[in-house]
Curated annotation (Swiss-Prot):
Gene3D superfamilies: DD-peptidase/beta-lactamase superfamily. Homotetramer. Its EC number is 3.5.1.2. This is Glutaminase. GO terms for molecular function: glutaminase activity. SUPFAM superfamilies: beta-lactamase/transpeptidase-like. It catalyses: L-glutamine + H2O = L-glutamate + NH4(+). Pfam families: Glutaminase. It comes from Cytophaga hutchinsonii (strain ATCC 33406 / DSM 1761 / CIP 103989 / NBRC 15051 / NCIMB 9469 / D465).
Length: 304
């Protein structure tokens, strides 16, 4: 299958959708990004690559980083972690406090903000320098030592992240955050600020398409069981509160971020990464979602 030709077709078809939606202006450092930007990248497990548009341009990956820290966490402790965070779709906004109160400080899943705080707290407990550990892991799986945090974005989130702090302290009151809340949230804001390109992302998550093994280095990142489980959580919980519609339209394990990125896994075959900053009301890239829908329609690459 000629993936470059397919992506070229998508680049033409997607033009009417570019610029639609709203950038994540509640994070001041992201407010000025051009919503018409668009990039897409494919990496297959046997080394085939294809890109279009702004696939080489770095952007703030935001909640896509939650896959990285979840991978680190399950490799450290894949049993006790699930006593602190659930595995169910939330059906609520990713930063909702209401559900957290009703469920005694146990977040529904690791991909909503509260759940990601718990995961970051677990990672924090295992490393002397958790920010450096997360960065080193990201560079390793992406095979790009130039990847770094965007410190302007991290500072912007720290200055405006009052709801995240509220969630952290609320869970702390239930005993579900072990370390100092502000220290954990500082790490969380930095992981969300990671600056990566579509090319970086489509390479970094190949281990999830290859039973936990990174084909670029043949290094085992996590067990097949945990790789399967992360894929399952991405399918059911990875696209905020429009996960059902996304599964209907695309049908791939995926994770989005409010920076406009989406990563999708085709198990046993490839990783697709797309970026366009204009967001839907639920916080997912509008053009990115459409591009993935077109890709699945053209290729039949869905898990169903």
């Amino acid at each position: 299958m000629n993936y470059q030709a397919i992506l070229n077709q998508i680049q033409g078809d997607i033009q009417p959708y570019l610029g639609q939606g709203k950038v994540a202006d509640y994070i001041p450092a992201l407010a000025g990004i051009n919503p018409s930007k668009f990039g897409m990248s494919i990496h297959t497990i046997d080394g085939i690559t294809a890109t279009i548009g702004d696939a080489q341009e770095q952007f703030s990956i935001q909640s896509i980083s939650k896959i990285l820290t979840l991978t680190m966490a399950v490799s450290l402790d894949d049993t006790n972690i699930w006593k602190r965070v659930g595995r169910e779709p939330s059906g609520s906004k990713f930063n909702s406090l209401i559900q957290l109160e009703l469920e005694q400080g146990i977040p529904r899943n690791p991909f909503i903000n509260a759940g990601a705080h718990v995961i970051t707290d677990l990672v924090y407990s295992h490393f002397d320098d958790p920010k450096e550990a997360i960065l080193a892991f990201t560079r390793m799986v992406s095979m790009n030592d130039s990847i770094s945090y965007d410190y302007v974005v991290a500072q912007s989130e720290r200055e405006t992240g009052n709801r995240n702090l509220a969630m952290g302290y609320f869970m702390k009151s239930f005993g579900n955050i072990e370390n100092k809340v502000r220290d954990v949230l500082d790490v969380y804001f930095h992981q969300c600020s990671l600056a990566m390109s579509c090319t970086d992302l489509s390479k970094a998550f190949l281990y999830l398409a290859n039973e936990g093994v990174l084909p670029t280095s043949e290094k085992t990142i996590i067990t097949k069981k945990n790789s399967d489980r992360i894929n399952a959580l991405m399918l059911t919980c990875g696209m905020y509160d429009s996960v059902g519609d996304f599964a209907y339209r695309v049908g791939l394990p995926s994770k989005s971020g409010v920076g406009g990125g989406i990563v999708s896994i085709v198990p046993g075959e490839m990783v697709i990464a797309v970026w366009s900053p204009g967001l839907s009301e639920s916080g997912n890239s509008l053009a990115g979602t459409k591009a993935l829908e077109l890709f699945v329609n053209y290729t039949g690459k869905t898990i169903f």
